[in-house]
């Protein structure tokens, strides 16, 4: 897919982070960087551990030219894979791009180098509302890179025909509404995302740790489930763009791609993404430096380079992602910037919530409830 693979974010993150082996096929070790030169600019090899298709090729080429460097990318498909690989002993990565709740795990485990902010003058370009988070006060370890929202995407033609207003979570969770398009709804195969959506629908903080709240959310999901066709995190872009599915809970970047694909196929509908009236989950990916980084000087140079407005804008133009960089906005294509599910107004932005890492007891309870839901 064009965007990075959707994430089933950290259902058992600490357990995965502490494993000693993950059973995956070994990837080549990160490239070794030659000794730094005496030039004022750092150079050598930058080992980047990133989501697939999550940096524009022209951005990489420009960085390599400016610094006389070589960027070697290794990819992960979700945060669990990345955490498991690092927990199993993988080293040699300079910059890694974890989502915020995976970042929280890495900080707690002591896996990251503190940033030298004197080497990051472009921090001034960042949007204040995405900085200084509860899990990384003062951005000691991280700089936000890009973000997506977990929202509702829909086929505008089919929703109009069904008489459904898809701008609220009622479209997914109220059986009287959702079953109007029974069999044509797909939701992410992720307890993080589905429970969070149910919490927001019920007016509950998605970071709740209350057992009663989890039981209420599970009941709401169970009541709506007969109206849904599938739990799907892998192929819903295609299902929407082909017209098989009409309504979905998914990622804003994926709905952007689904609409591009529908237009390319000359479909007579659009795939529209909306932030539900009740609010939504915000997933921020961050740039960090691993404790084993062989070239921390070049890592700092790369992070600072990526905070320049034009460089930051190129990812948004490539995949339709949200952008944490205020200086990038002037370089983002108008059709991307017009996507209100990615670039909402200030009032809507206040309704977005980042997920925190759940305590172990709540992870176990949620896992049990999720199993009950799936086998219902």
Question: What positions do the PLM features span?
Answer:
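Mature extracytoplasmic/periplasmic domains
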Residues: 290-351
């Amino acid at each position: 897919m064009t965007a990075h693979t959707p994430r089933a974010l950290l259902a058992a993150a600490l357990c995965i982070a502490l494993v000693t082996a993950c059973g995956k096929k070994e990837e080549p070790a990160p490239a070794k960087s030659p000794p730094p030169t005496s030039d004022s600019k750092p150079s050598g090899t930058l080992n980047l551990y990133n989501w697939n298709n999550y940096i524009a090729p022209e951005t990489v080429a420009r960085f390599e030219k400016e610094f006389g460097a070589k960027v070697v990318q290794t990819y992960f498909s979700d945060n669990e894979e990345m955490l498991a690989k690092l927990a199993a002993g993988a080293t040699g990565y300079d910059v890694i791009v974890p989502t915020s709740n995976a970042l929280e795990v890495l900080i707690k485990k002591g896996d990251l180098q503190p940033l030298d902010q004197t080497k990051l003058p472009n921090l001034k370009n960042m949007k204040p509302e995405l900085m200084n988070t509860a899990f990384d006060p003062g951005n000691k370890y991280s700089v936000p890179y890009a973000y997506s929202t977990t929202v509702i995407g829909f086929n505008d033609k089919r929703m109009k025909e069904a008489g459904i207003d898809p701008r609220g979570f009622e479209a997914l969770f109220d059986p009287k509404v959702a079953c109007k398009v029974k069999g044509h709804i797909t939701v992410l195969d992720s307890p993080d995302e589905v429970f969070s959506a149910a919490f927001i629908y019920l007016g509950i903080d998605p970071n709740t740790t209350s057992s009663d709240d989890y039981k209420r959310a599970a009941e709401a999901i169970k009541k709506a489930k007969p109206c849904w066709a599938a739990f799907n995190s892998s192929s819903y872009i295609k299902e929407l763009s082909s017209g098989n599915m009409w309504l979905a809970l998914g990622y804003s970047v994926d709905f952007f791609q689904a609409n591009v694909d529908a237009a390319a196929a000359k479909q007579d509908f659009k795939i529209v993404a909306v932030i539900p009236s009740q609010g939504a989950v915000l997933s921020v990916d961050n740039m960090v430096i691993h404790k084993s980084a062989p070239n921390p000087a070049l890592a700092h140079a790369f992070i600072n380079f990526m905070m320049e407005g034009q460089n930051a804008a190129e990812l948004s133009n490539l995949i339709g992602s949200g952008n944490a960089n205020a200086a990038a906005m002037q370089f983002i294509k108008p059709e991307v910037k017009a996507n209100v599910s990615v670039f909402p107004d200030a009032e809507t932005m206040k309704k977005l919530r980042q997920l925190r890492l759940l305590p172990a007891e709540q992870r176990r309870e949620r896992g049990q409830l999720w199993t009950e839901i799936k086998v219902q």
